[in-house]
């Protein structure tokens, strides 16, 4: 018999409804979170090279936390803002 976590993490934390309040649409949220997750991932990749081109996580992280989870917590915390661009 499998075990079920009593406090599931991931997309349920932060709640999707709270995240949607921070953007204009669910599609904007996906793009916003994905771009920030790529930045966080690039930051971790460049640490060993001594380059500091990207901004690291703006929230406390755990060692195995995924960049997308970090990005969503940053968005939910109001630490990031989405700026509309004129580019397609």
Curated annotation (Swiss-Prot):
Pfam families: RNA_pol_Rpb6. The keyword Oxidoreductase does not apply. Promotes RNA polymerase assembly. Latches the N- and C-terminal regions of the beta' subunit thereby facilitating its interaction with the beta and alpha subunits. Belongs to the RNA polymerase subunit omega family. It is an enzyme of class 2 (transferase). It comes from Salinispora tropica (strain ATCC BAA-916 / DSM 44818 / JCM 13857 / NBRC 105044 / CNB-440). Its EC number is 2.7.7.6. It comes from the Bacteria. One of its GO terms (cellular component) is DNA-directed RNA polymerase complex. Keywords: DNA-directed RNA polymerase, Nucleotidyltransferase, Transcription, Transferase. PANTHER family: DNA-DIRECTED RNA POLYMERASE SUBUNIT OMEGA. This is DNA-directed RNA polymerase subunit omega. HAMAP family: RNApol_bact_RpoZ. SUPFAM superfamilies: RPB6/omega subunit-like. The RNAP catalytic core consists of 2 alpha, 1 beta, 1 beta' and 1 omega subunit. When a sigma factor is associated with the core the holoenzyme is formed, which can initiate transcription. GO terms for molecular function: DNA binding; DNA-directed RNA polymerase activity. It catalyses: RNA(n) + a ribonucleoside 5'-triphosphate = RNA(n+1) + diphosphate. The keyword Transferase applies. InterPro entries: DNA-dir_RNA_pol_omega, Pol_omega/Rpo6/RPB6, RPB6/omega-like_sf. One of its GO terms (biological process) is DNA-templated transcription.
